[in-house]
Each structure stands twice: as structure tokens, then as C-alpha cells.
Amino acid sequence: MVCVPCFIVPVLLYLWHKFVQPILLKYWNPWEKKDADGNMIKTEPKNPFDCAGGVCRWAGKKTAVPPGHDPVGPTVAADTATSDAVDDAASSKKTL
């Protein structure tokens, strides 16, 4: 059986950090940044997914296809050659 403090303390810590602490920090926050006059410096949290100034930091880089490179993939002849080899291997196993 689990002792009562081993169950109650983690639950209370979770409730404190999830619900109570954010409410209290809105009214009393000793760690907030202040200017020389003692006024709170308001900074909005920066969202890393915002696209500011027409530039998105998380957009994928577009790469140009080199000349002479086939972006489609291997040719049909190469696909049939590999499938013939697979069929030959399968038929040889059946004959044994």
C-alpha cells in the first residue's frame, strides 16, 4: 500500500503548478523584469511559429533541381528488371 504523503504531495504539487501558481504570479511576481523607475517591462511571449516581416523561420528551404536530374525516379525498364529477378527467385524456390 502506498503511504498517504507519497500520493498527496505529488497531487498537491501538480495542482499548485498547474492552477494556483499562474494566478498568483499575475498579481505578485518577484522575478518580473523592471526598468530603472521600478515599472514592469511588458514583453509578449514570442511564438516561434510566427512569420514576422514576411519571413517564416520554420519554412522549408526550396532547393533547385540540378540540370539533367530526373525528379520522377527510376525508369520503367529498371523496375521491370528488378521484378523479373524477384520472379526468378520465387520460381526457383517453388521448384525445390
Curated annotation (Swiss-Prot):
The species is Anopheles gambiae
Q: Which residue intervals are annotated with compositional bias (Low complexity) in the record?
A: 75-96
Disordered: region residues: 65-96
Q: Which PANTHER family match?
A: UPF0729 PROTEIN C18ORF32 (PTHR13456:SF0)
Q: Which family does it belong to?
A: Belongs to the UPF0729 family.
- UniProt cross-references to Pfam families, sorted A to Z: DUF4512
Tell me the superkingdom of the source: Eukaryota
UniProt-recorded name of the protein? UPF0729 protein AGAP000931
